[in-house]
Every structure is written in structure tokens, then in C-alpha cells.
Regions:
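Asp-based, Mg2+/Mn2+-dependent phosphohydrolase catalytic module
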Residues: 2-20, 27-45, 62-78, 88-268
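Conserved phosphate/oxyanion-binding catalytic-loop motifs
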Residues: 56
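N-terminal phosphate-binding loop and flanking beta/alpha elements of the actin-like ATPase fold
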Residues: 49
Length: 268
């Protein structure tokens, strides 16, 4: 684990692409961090690229692009990665044509429909669990019934909590999965960070080798863990969920630790 600035600077020489988490890394809730623009401008000035990757499956691609635009960050579609697209690509390869029951927001359901999936409320082949801020007892009950009856069961993102303003949190997809597990005894395979399928997706989308990629985020068990056992550089920022004292008690160790991306901008 590197904290020395000169060593971080040396490590950054090989990096061509930065994959940035969003909540807790570039903004918190509705508030953009004051150093975010400086970091992004520095990345471009040093002829590197940046992409955003969010595990938050409650919104669609357009919503995230619009949110960034509203914060003064204009990006191409290819620069915005969402955990939903990781599972959609995998499902297309392995379960094309199957019928799905999506526990998710209207935006998530529309995303599945836009990619050609048939949503089935009666007898689906697959249950998909997303971060559902519109969750109801009826949805939970149906999902549990379908899972007990033998439907395949996949989760989009394993995050337990979603960070909000004023150091508050709301239950995320991982917490919902634990609720379903308590009822059915089944826990899903997840596809967002830290899944190896997400890492494969990032490498494929960027066209870079793993040793040229750095992933930046505020969560040890998703943003940092996704790089474990790979040549991808993991950079933990302390501007979101994780505090410095959490690192000592965690099995997941980042390659680099910084207070926030504003510090990293000075080392590129």
C-alpha cells in the first residue's frame, strides 16, 4: 500500500486510463467535490483518458450523463459505464431469449426492455435484483416465490448501502439480497464491482491492458476489491464511505491511498 507522494507519482507513469467511481469519489449526493474538475482537466492535459463506472443500478445511462452534464462535466456515452451493462452483456451471451423478472426501478426495467429482454411477471426463467428505490412487498414476495420455484437468480451490484449527503446512507442492492436470502436461502451472483466480469468489461471497453488501468473509488469491498489479483492499480479515496481506520481491519488492501482525487491531480 503506497501513501508516499513520490512513489505514487512513479506508479502513475504507466497509467493511461482512470476508471472513476462516482458517489463518494467525484461527488456526494448532489454536490460535486471542488477538486473534481481540476483532476479531470489534468487527466486530459496529460493525454490520458477517464471513464466513470457506477455500481448504482437504479438509474439508466442517460440519467448519469445528464447528472454529470448538470455538474459541468460533458462526456461521450462510451465514457459512462454502469453495472447494469455488465450483466446485460453477460446475459446476452449466456441466456439470450430467456424471460426475466426484474426487481428494480422503472428506469432499470426500461433498460432491460431496450436491450430486447421480455419482462415476465408470472413465470420467469431468471430473477434479476437491482438497486430498487421503488421496492415493494409485492415485488419481494414475487421474487422469493420465483427463486423457490427454481428461477435462476442474479444480482446487479452488491453494495450494502448507497451514500447520501450529510454522512447518511440508504439500503442498496446488497442489503436487499440479504433480505431475500433470509427468506429463500439463496444469494445471487453479482455482476457489478467487485465481480471479475466487471474487470473484463472495463478492459474490453477501454482497449487497454490491465497494467495501464487505475480504478479509483471510496469503497474497499467494491471499488478496490475489483482489482484484487490483477495488474490493475487500485486507488482508495477517503472522501466517501471508507475511513482511514477501516483499512487496517479490512482483508482488502488498496495499492494507493489518498485523501481525494484533488491530491492525485498534483501527482500526474
Amino acid at each position: 500500500m503506497i501513501t508516499d507522494k513520490k512513489m505514487i507519482q512513479k506508479k502513475m507513469e504507466a497509467i493511461r486510463v482512470f476508471i472513476l467511481d462516482m458517489d463518494g469519489t467525484i461527488y456526494l449526493g448532489k454536490n460535486l467535490f471542488p477538486y473534481t474538475h481540476d483532476f479531470l482537466n489534468t487527466v486530459k492535459a496529460t493525454e490520458r483518458e477517464y471513464y466513470f463506472f457506477t455500481n448504482n443500478s437504479s438509474r439508466d445511462l442517460a440519467a448519469y450523463i445528464d447528472k454529470l452534464h448538470g455538474m459541468g462535466i460533458d462526456i461521450d456515452k462510451k465514457q459512462m459505464m454502469v453495472s447494469t451493462h455488465v450483466i446485460l452483456r453477460w446475459l446476452k451471451k449466456h441466456h439470450d431469449g430467456r424471460r426475466v423478472y426484474v426487481v428494480g426501478t422503472p428506469a432499470l426495467r426500461k433498460e432491460f426492455e431496450a436491450h430486447g429482454w421480455i419482462l415476465d411477471e408470472e413465470k420467469p426463467d431468471i430473477v434479476i435484483l437491482g438497486f430498487d428505490t421503488t421496492l415493494t412487498y409485492e415485488k419481494l414476495s414475487k421474487a422469493c416465490t420465483f427463486i423457490r420455484e427454481g428461477a435462476l437468480y442474479y444480482g446487479i451490484n452488491p453494495d450494502l448501502n448507497c451514500p447520501m449527503e450529510h454522512d447518511t446512507f440508504i439500503p442498496d442492492c446488497g442489503s436487499m439480497a440479504k433480505l431475500i436470502e433470509a427468506s429463500t436461502g439463496k444469494y445471487p451472483e453479482f455482476f457489478g464491482k467487485p465481480s471479475g466480469k466487471t474487470l473484463d468489461y472495463i478492459v474490453e471497453e477501454t482497449g487497454c491492458s490491465p497494467d495501464q488501468i487505475a480504478i479509483i473509488g471510496d469503497r474497499l469491498y467494491t471499488d478496490i476489491k475489483v482489482a484484487d489479483g490483477s495488474q490493475v492499480t487500485s486507488i482508495l479515496v477517503l472522501s466517501g464511505e471508507t475511513k482511514a481506520e477501516d483499512i487496517d481491519t479490512s482483508d482488502v488492501k488498496p495499492d494507493i491511498v489518498i485523501e481525494h482525487i484533488g491530491e492525485l491531480a498534483k501527482l500526474l
